[in-house]
Every structure is written in structure tokens, then in C-alpha cells.
Amino acid sequence: MMSTDHCPAPLLRIQPQFSHYAQRARLAQRESLFYEALELSMAPMLDGNAAAACREWYKSSGRVNAIHGAFIDVNPASGDPAFRELSRRRCRESCTLAVELGAEQVVFHSSAFPFLRGGYLENWADLCAAFYMELAEEYRGLTLCIENSQDLDPEPLEALMKRTGDGVRVCLDIGHAHYSGTPLEAWFDVLGPSIACLHLSDNMGRFDDHLPIGDGGIDWAMADRLYQGLGKELPMTLEVGGLQGVDKSLAFLRRNGYFALEG
């Protein structure tokens, strides 16, 4: 049963771009925002010296609360040993980076193929759970948050959560849930106790548009009720494009008092 207690205002995060770091830093200071660093987990930042200045900026900011781990083509449960090994190396590198930058959470995408269940799903959940729990033990103090990405329903993440402990939780992406075809209530009902953070963006129900909050088809009043029903404060990341998207999203949330944000 969901709680009816009112949650306090959450810790809000954005995903800055180092190429516009000064603007992002001013926005973060003005709005008391933290960072979920994304770009360090994407090429060309994954290798070589290209990331040095970027890493130093994030480290010196004192605002990194989370890292979005490597996710492009990453599948730590791949049936191909070479792909599996590289995926796991990238995940471990993301955790090392998180420790370096002072993050508390690392977000990884769920890698389950959405149209296969049965033995495939059981094997995927077994392999991922063993690996993620190994990482959680190795990087104590970090919470690994597995995000619904191409998932059509909560079943893969539910299977994974049954095999893991407190160090491995769920990042519920509201936008991804919206275009999945499964009602948002089901995502909260099934995964609620395991949710450790939220990703917020809007879309029209077909693609991952990353629209400003309020510009798409998501029922944000319902999303707010479901969040409040969890009875716990969760960090939230605004994945809404550039500065204007963040400003517009914050104004919408505050105007409506959603997620305990006040104008």
C-alpha cells in the first residue's frame, strides 16, 4: 500500500554540457541544482585525454550527485563473451568515475531485450544481478540505479530487483514509462519500493523526445500523486534539453506545486 505522507522537496539534478559549462554553472547556482554527469560516459570522452578538462570541471564543481553510466550498446549479460566483457569494463569505469567525482548514484540502462521472456529473462536477470551486486560490493557507498529504457513493462526490472540488495535499485524514467504502453501506475505499483531516483522529461507517447515538462502528453498531476504515494524523497534529474528547457520545466512544476516544488 502506498503512503499518503507528503514528501519534502526533492534534490534536483541536470545533465550539463561541458562546452557550455559557465551557463550551466550559473543556472545550477541560481536554482540550487546538482549534476548527473552524462557526457563522460559517451564517446569521445570514454577514452584518451579528451575528458581531462571535463572531468576536472565536474570534480571542482562540487555538484556531482550522480553519474549516468556508459549505456550505448552496453549489455553486461550479452551472450557474446567479448561484448559482455567490454560492457562490464565500461560499467566498472563508470563506477570508478563516480567515486572520483564524489557521486552517490550511478545510473545504468536496463539491457533486457523487450520482446523475450521465459528462460531468456531469467538468464538476463541472473547474470545482471550477479554483476551489479559484485559492483555494489566493490564500490560501497554507491547506489547502482538501473533505468527502464527500452522496457515495455516493469517485469524485467522486477525480476532483477528480486535478485539484488540495497546497493542495486531502480531509476524510473517517467518519459520512458509513458511511451512504453504500460500505464504509469503499474510502474510505480510494481517497482515503488525499489525506486531510488527519477528521470523527468515529457513526450507525446511514441518517442523519447525529452521535451520540457508540460509540453507533452504525460499526466504530471498523476505522476505527482504516484510519487507522493511512495512516501520517500527521491533525487530527480531533468532531462529536458538545454537551459530554456530546464527553466520552462521548473516553472511548470513550481506553478503546479508538483513534487513538492513551490513557486
Identify the function of each model-found stretch.
Residues 32, 98, 103, 141, ...:
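A structural motif
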Residues 77-169:
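Active-site acidic/histidine proton-transfer and metal-coordination neighborhood
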Residues 2-7, 23-26, 104, 154-171, ...:
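Histidine-acidic metal/acid-base catalytic patches
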Residues 15-25, 39-52, 75-77, 114-118, ...:
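Acidic-and-aromatic substrate-binding clefts and catalytic sites of carbohydrate-active enzymes
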